[in-house]
Amino acid sequence: MAKKKKINVSSGIIHVSCSPNNTIVSASDPGGNVLCWASSGTMGFKGSRKKTPYSAGIAADKVAKTVKEMGMATVKLFVKGTGRGKDTAIRSFANAGLSITEINEKTPIPHNGCKPPKRPR
């Protein structure tokens, strides 16, 4: 197995995608190359526990820890989706000691596009 190269990056981009069932967090360098990622499912949560804010915070903590080991100090956050773990993920990055330069909301909003799915009974 090849040995992993040590990566040093001073700033980067973090994408947080919150669906109704899962939260995916990925970190990349300014060029867009993904450095690390985590989701509620990869952190060991299964089923209905994946959608909780707690699981989103755990996934964000793992990415924040990995990114700090790479030397990243400042990040831009891009948040997408309507899931419940969005705020918890943002707070996790702030509490980890990373300097957040900007937070962008990238949630797609339809201008009377497709019909939304039916509400669960």
UniProtKB/Swiss-Prot annotation:
It comes from the Bacteria. Gene3D superfamilies: Ribosomal protein S11. Disulfide bonds: none annotated. GO terms for biological process: translation. PROSITE patterns: RIBOSOMAL_S11. One of its GO terms (cellular component) is ribonucleoprotein complex. Keywords: Ribonucleoprotein, Ribosomal protein, RNA-binding, rRNA-binding. GO terms for molecular function: rRNA binding; structural constituent of ribosome. Belongs to the universal ribosomal protein uS11 family. Part of the 30S ribosomal subunit. Interacts with proteins S7 and S18. Binds to IF-3. Located on the platform of the 30S subunit, it bridges several disparate RNA helices of the 16S rRNA. Forms part of the Shine-Dalgarno cleft in the 70S ribosome. HAMAP family: Ribosomal_uS11. This is Small ribosomal subunit protein uS11. It comes from Mycoplasma pneumoniae (strain ATCC 29342 / M129 / Subtype 1).
